[in-house]
Amino acid sequence: MSKNYWLLKSEPSTWSWQDQVKSKIDMWDGVRNYQAGNNLTKMKKGDQCFFYHSVNEKSIVGIVEVHKEHYPDPTDKSKKFVAIDVKTVKKLKYPVTLDRIKKNQKLKEMPLIKQSRLSVMPLTIDEFNEILKLSNINE
């Protein structure tokens, strides 16, 4: 079975990379957008996800892995949305900022640019690998 790649956005004041690292494995909950929620249902155990700090930082800071596939989000009273569990994989050597992503021609079709409000989005393997390359360069 092939691995899929994703980007998960989080507000650092709500759930930061540091929180994720301390927890090691935790629930990714609180998604209330239908498209983002549908993306959660497509995730499979072992899929790789970039951890993106939204709001002020606007940068990819780490990698997590889907540890448990979707289940009902216990924080959702309407019972319409799902959660997943993610496991910390590693911190990126250097954060990859939204500005750097926008300037990279290989990433111009990324949902992060095309659908900037979406909090859970698919990535191609080429996009994932290009971001990994950028994370090894300090700019």
Where on the chain are the PLM-derived regions?
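Compositionally biased, charged N-terminal/linker segments
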Residues: 1-44, 128, 135-139
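GIY-YIG nuclease signature motif recognition
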Residues: 8, 64, 124
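Short, charged, solvent-exposed linker or helix-capping segments at domain edges/interfaces
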Residues: 19, 95-101, 132-134
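Hydrophobic beta-strand signal
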Residues: 50-51, 65
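Short, charged beta-turn/beta-strand-edge "cap" motif at the junction between a beta-strand
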Residues: 52-58
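Aromatic- and Lys/Arg-enriched surface recognition patch
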Residues: 61-121
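Long, low-complexity intrinsically disordered regions
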Residues: 109-139
